[in-house]
Amino acid sequence: MLLAVAFVLAAASGVAHADEPKDFIDDARVFYRVVSCGNTAPVPADLDQATVDKHCAAMQKLYDTWHKTYAEPASKFFAALRPQGLPTTVVYPFGGGDLGSALVTYPDARDITTISLEHAGDPTRVAHLKKAQLREALSNFRAAIGGLLTLHDSTTENMLKLESGGIPGQLSFHITGMTAMGYEPVSLKFFKLEDDGSIHYYSQSEIDALAHRTAKKIKSKWVDTDFSEAFNNMELTFRKAGDPKAPLIVHRHIAWNLADKAFKGSPLEKYLLAKGKVVAMTKAASYLIWDWGFSGIRQYLLDNMVWMASDATGIPPKAAKKAGFKQTTYGTFTGPFLEEANKTVGADMVELWASQPKRRLPFRYGYPDMDKHVHLMITAPKETK
């Protein structure tokens, strides 16, 4: 009886239990204030205010560029194209660090999944950085995020630089994208996928138990991290800043290799299939969706998406046509800029753009082509007569 009473009292008092998911919202708010400069609240006592102020002044200039050259024109562009009644679930393969673009492309989204080789990262370090460490970490972060906020995609090199240290790349980039679009964090949790694709959120005791198991690179030609494998995958819940009644948006970043050997039949594939019909996007994806070794993620998209925005690294034209999709092109595409891209699909893409009227594209969306032209395509079901 006494144990039952104690349990009820503990529940009523809001005391966290050992098996409850650990919420790192306090750490997320530190990132929101110190790294992405989402508000002007005092910084944590251990951090140098002047260093943060200087960083935030530089960030504001990057945000101004982001909105002027990308968020504003792209938002208007997509608003005129998106059909009514699209799913509010977004899947963004090869979407490392690019939550901001997902919100630009799909502003009505409520569930967003980005997938890349990079791990989410440890959220607990930044609040304890010494002045010199903080200055260096913020400088490295700005150097990396600058490409995203000025060129609107994240390079592999920039992602790799932040796979270790006090300000991990995926966590910081996604919170920055959220901040750039006017949102604030509500919850931050970490998880793994069970064999059936369901989500298992880590409790504090599980995170403690994994503290000495360092996350390893997912692909051989990548880099190892210096943080626990508990921080591989993140779930960031957020809403419009200053509006407690605004709808919640859930973003999950999952560290996974999308090559067939790792994806087909995997917990990730099952997790994605459980979502039902989705909208999709990809850009700056190294032309991997063209590749025979990525047939699983390509087929998943063809079977489950109802609308997709991409640069030319999206679905190959012949595969799209066979699955009943029509592709509408914008800008100019004269060929992939990476020599290792599939040449047959590259030629098909050139033919696709050449076969359609030239439609203006007022912003960069992913890679430029081999001649530095911006381009974009929409893959959508063919209209039924």
For each feature predicted by the language model, list its residue ranges:
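Short, solvent-exposed linear motifs at loop/edge-of-secondary-structure regions
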Residues: 1-3, 166-184
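Non-globular targeting/processing and membrane-anchoring segments
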Residues: 19-147, 224, 228-230, 235-385
